[in-house]
Amino acid sequence: MLKTVLRLPVCAALLALAAGCAMIPPEPVVICPLTAPPPSPPQPSARPNGSIYQPSAYGNYPLFEDRRPRNVGDIVTIVLEEKTNAAKGVATNTSRDGSATLGVAAAPRFMDGIINDKLDTDISGGNTANGTGKSSANNTFTGTITTTVIGVLPNGNLQIAGEKQIAINRGSEYVRFSGVVDPRSITGSNTVSSTRVADARIEYRSKGVMDEVQTMGWLQRFFLIASPF
């Protein structure tokens, strides 16, 4: 009776641990902050000097220049135009042949009945191996996502990051993007192609019924780990 009482908590603990491993979340690709940090407290305005152009009113934007992102908190629209094609083929053919012959030309007369015609030996062997392998991958990702400038590098390049979430019925999808962009690559419509973004990290995932269907059950994964085949 005591063994049965002790066995129940152990089984319950094992089931709880197994349930915790039922859904292993994938590792994120975008690991930087997705929004700009909060602005610093406003500084006291400078004393008016009578000029028409006041930097305090226009920020760090020059007077005769388009308003393009250059400060933390500005937004940039990324046009996703990712397309990759890769193919690889391998073929290997190897062969090897070998032979050896061992014999005694003459033996003493008194040993004729013992070893005569018994030391002639022929040994041969062969080995052949053929292997082929092919792999290919095609990926296409198009769309748009608006990001925020989260940092400005010393050379003027902008660190951008952003996220877009879409919830449909019981499922949700999200797109995350981060990278470094040159302000000179940004067009007049405040857009830039994803192919012109350095250190680009693009993440597209979903949560819902479809995501659960594509995930192997925890008990099946357990037996797959324990199976030697």
UniProtKB/Swiss-Prot annotation:
A lipid is attached at C21 (S-diacylglycerol cysteine). Keywords: Bacterial flagellum, Cell outer membrane, Lipoprotein, Membrane, Palmitate, Signal. It is a lipid-anchor. Pfam families: FlgH (PF02107). One of its GO terms (molecular function) is cytoskeletal motor activity. It comes from the Bacteria. A lipid is attached at C21 (N-palmitoyl cysteine). One of its GO terms (cellular component) is bacterial-type flagellum basal body, distal rod, L ring. One of its GO terms (biological process) is bacterial-type flagellum-dependent cell motility. HAMAP family: FlgH. Assembles around the rod to form the L-ring and probably protects the motor/basal body from shearing forces during rotation. Belongs to the FlgH family. This is Flagellar L-ring protein. It comes from Bordetella pertussis (strain Tohama I / ATCC BAA-589 / NCTC 13251). The gene is flgH.
